[in-house]
Amino acid sequence: MSYNCCSGNFSSRSCGDYLRYPASSRGFSYPSNLVYSTDLCSPSTCQLGSSLYRGCQEICWEPTSCQTSYVESSPCQTSCYRPRTSLLCSPCKTTYSGSLGFGSSSCRSLGYGSRSCYSVGCGSSGVRSLGYGSCGFPSLGYGSGFCRPTYLASRSCQSPCYRPAYGSTFCRSTC
């Protein structure tokens, strides 16, 4: 089964913990092992390899100028980033600056190499190390390490915290 969780050049959908964006665009290089497609997203079960993840969320990526991000549905959060410079572009509700970079409204720093992730609107929280391949979750290339602190069985909500390319760190809630 293939997933339908992406749309647009700089407006990319994510499904579960996996961020989707183009391999390259406007002269900027992105990790080529992250999946990108132009399909429209629907809040259904999506597949990446042999793993299934529920819930879709939109994150806006624009290397030169930030687009306006918006909350797609009540429990879910969206953010806008400049991935090359790791600058949070707004309009996130709350932001912080931690030891590993900039983050969105669902993250708090617990010191170097760790984050406490709070799934705003879902009521879950958790703490995991951000080391490469730790937490038993896959480590993608270019310094990406994925962690999923908490999953609520009552709702399809997760609070993944991960370090993408270029050493930046941010967390988001996915519902």
Curated annotation (Swiss-Prot):
- Molecular function terms from GO: structural molecule activity
Instruction: Locate the coiled-coil region(s) and give their ranges.
Output: none
What Pfam families does the annotation carry?
A: PMG
Instruction: Keywords in alphabetical order, please.
Output: Keratin, Repeat
What is said about its interaction partners and assembly? Interacts with hair keratins.
What task does this protein carry out?
In the hair cortex, hair keratin intermediate filaments are embedded in an interfilamentous matrix, consisting of hair keratin-associated proteins (KRTAP), which are essential for the formation of a rigid and resistant hair shaft through their extensive disulfide bond cross-linking with abundant cysteine residues of hair keratins. The matrix proteins include the high-sulfur and high-glycine-tyrosine keratins.
What protein name applies here?
Answer: Keratin-associated protein 13-2
What is the organism of origin for this protein?
Homo sapiens
